[in-house]
Amino acid sequence: MGIRLYRAYTPGTRFRSVSEFTDITRSKPEKSLTYGRHRSQGRNNRGIITSRHRGGGHKRLSREIDFRRDKVGIPARVATIEYDPNRNCRIALLNYQDGEKRYVLHPRGLMVGEEIIAGPDAPLQLGNALPLSKIPLGTGIHNIEVSPGQGGKLVRAAGGVAQLVAKEGSYVTVRLPSGEVRLVLKECSATIGQVGNVDASNVTIGKAGRKRWLGQRPKVRGVVMNPVDHPHGGGEGRAPIGRSKPVTPWGHPALGKRTRKRNKYSNALIIRRRK
C-alpha cells in the first residue's frame, strides 16, 4: 500500500494524492457492527456554533471498534481488512471461535487468515493484546489503555507506534509517538505492533472541495476580518495585527501558548513532555 499521485489534468488534481486501497479486501462493512450517528455540525443543543469550521461532508456509517480486547483466551481469525471513513487507519474484522464478530484497528503487516488472541497468556506476536507487565522491553505497541479495562486510549492513529522502555514497581514507562515519556499502570493492556496505513500522513488534500467532503469548512484569517469580528481585524489595506502577540477571536493568547491545565491529574505520570 502506498500513495497514488495524479497528473495535472485539472487544477484540482495538480497536487492531489490519495491512499491506495490495495490492502482492502471488502467494500461493504459488517452490518451488525455499524450504526448511524447524528452529526452536530459544530453546534450545541441550542444550535449555537461551539466548534467553528465544521459542517457538511459525506454521510458516514460508524463502526463499532473493539478497543478493550476483553475476549480473553478466545482465538479469532482475521476475516477482512476494511476501510473506515471515521479514522485514517484500516480496520480488521475478526471472527471469534464462539461465533462473535468484532472490529479492531488493523496492525501493519497483519494478513487475512491469520489468528490472533488477547489475554495475559497470549504469545508475543503481531495483533495480540497483552497486559503491559507481560510485554518485553523495546517492543512496539499501540492501542494502550490508561486505566485497566477502560479500553485503549493512546496511539490509535495510522502509523502510530509506542515503545516500552522500562518497568518499575506498579508502572511501566512508555515512549509515545509525540516524544512524550509517561508512566502507565502495568495492569493496562496494549496491542503488539504498529498501526497500519503508515503513509496516511503523506496524503495531500489538493483542493478545497476535498476538505468539504471531509466536513471541514473554510478557515478565515482574523487579519482579513473587520474589527467587530476579530481582534486582528481592521486597518487600512494589508495592516498588521496591531498587537504584541497574536490572540484568538476571544482575546486569549494564540500560536504557542500552552493550553494544558496546570493541575491535571496525569501531570505526575509524565516524565518528559512531548516535543
Swiss-Prot record:
Alphabetized UniProt keyword annotations: Chloroplast, Plastid, Ribonucleoprotein, Ribosomal protein
Q: A Pfam family for this UniProt protein?
A: Ribosomal_L2
Query: Which terms in the GO cellular component ontology are assigned?
Result: chloroplast; mitochondrial large ribosomal subunit
Q: What is this protein called?
A: Large ribosomal subunit protein uL2c
Name the segments for region: Disordered: 29-60, 225-252
The UniProt entry's sequence similarity note says: Belongs to the universal ribosomal protein uL2 family.
SMART domains per the UniProt record, alphabetical: Ribosomal_L2, Ribosomal_L2_C
- Basic residues composition bias: which ranges? 51-60
Cellular location(s): Plastid, Chloroplast
Which Gene Ontology molecular-function terms are recorded? rRNA binding; structural constituent of ribosome; transferase activity
Database matches in NCBIfam families: rplB_bact (TIGR01171)
Lineage, top-rank taxon, reads Eukaryota
Assembly and interaction partners: Part of the 50S ribosomal subunit.
Q: Which GO terms describe its biological process?
A: mitochondrial translation
